Amino acid sequence: MNENLNGILNVYKEAGWTSFDVVAKLRCILKTKKIGHGGTLDPSVTGVLPIAVGKSTRLLEYMEAAGKIYEGQVTIGFSTETEDADGAIVNQTPVKNNLTESEIDSAMSRFVGKIKQIPPMYSAVKINGKKLYEYARAGQTIERPAREITIKSFVRTSPIDWNKEEGLVTFSFKVECSKGTYVRTLAVDLADSLGYAGHMSKLQRTASNGLLIKDAIKLSKIEEIQESGKLSTILYPAEYAVSDLPRVNLTTVQFDMARVGKKFAQSDWTNEVETADSSVNKTKQQEYLLTDLSLLTTEKFAAFYNDKLVAVYMKHPEKEGIWKPNKVLV
């Protein structure tokens, strides 16, 4: 077993693989059990699957919580039981000739921001201790509570393609969204807002945790690289796991506090002269010093010292102006 590996892999998940399949295969390739993924992709979905290896698996919760970018395709004219191209058709509503690109664009813009979304029946969301897809496979449809998600952007990226014979309209899109977003449900809801049935006919994740589709590597290639002894050349540093969090650069005094799990109070640093190093920032996070804590709008921040991730801090749930360690990594 190789338990010394540590870092993040940008894996290209191919169609037909579950996210767990990828993890299981990598455990064999890398000969280590300490592997986990940073956000599930459905089997038919391709693209970026961030993988944490070694000690970086302690950061999986932040990887999973990070926003994601997807590119895909919506087909308007019929819906399926799984809301994607794999499911059986359940409703057909041939599209009329008067549906315009401007109507579609206007409808898409109304989904941007904080919205409520009901998770699909074919999903791993648990209700009463049972996954929704288990109910669905048993022919049951149950009530699901709506969940709040955030859509940062949702735009059409191609002209609409008319299939007048079948009454179908297809177009490509790009969406940047928060954790917990079901993009196939977004496609269904978009079509419904236009007065038609619809589904997501194609999807690829193009970015996650600062990792991009152009740099993603297939499992077969990772196996070749591992066999050649050059895996370190494709391992990203652990800080990519927290690329969605603001970065706070610590001074030596503050680092000594963080490494032993001490809390930070904003009031303690308002008059300090900061000399924290910020010479390198690979993930292009917005940088702060402890004097800037009052400017943060997030519940957590990533603490760095000499360009190394040392801890993740979170707002104290009961004490105003106090930040406590959520995870110490040194």
UniProtKB/Swiss-Prot annotation:
Active site: residue positions: 42
Organism: Lactococcus lactis subsp. cremoris (strain SK11)
Keyword tRNA processing: yes
Purpose of the protein: Responsible for synthesis of pseudouridine from uracil-55 in the psi GC loop of transfer RNAs.
Entry EC number(s): 5.4.99.25
PANTHER family assigned to the protein according to its UniProt record, in alphabetical order: PSEUDOURIDYLATE SYNTHASE TRUB1 (PTHR13767:SF2), TRNA-PSEUDOURIDINE SYNTHASE (PTHR13767)
Membership in a protein family: Belongs to the pseudouridine synthase TruB family. Type 1 subfamily.
Record keywords, A-Z: Isomerase, tRNA processing
Catalytic EC class: isomerase
Pfam entry (one): TruB_C_2
Catalysed reaction equations from the record: uridine(55) in tRNA = pseudouridine(55) in tRNA
Listed Gene3D superfamilies: Pseudouridine synthase
Protein name per Swiss-Prot or TrEMBL: tRNA pseudouridine synthase B
Domain of life of the source: Bacteria
Disulfide bonds: none
Annotated GO biological process: mRNA pseudouridine synthesis; tRNA pseudouridine synthesis
Single GO molecular function: RNA binding
SUPFAM superfamilies cross-referenced by the UniProt entry: Pseudouridine synthase
InterPro entries: PsdUridine_synth_cat_dom_sf (IPR020103), PsdUridine_synth_N (IPR002501), tRNA_psdUridine_synth_TruB (IPR014780), TruB_C (IPR032819)
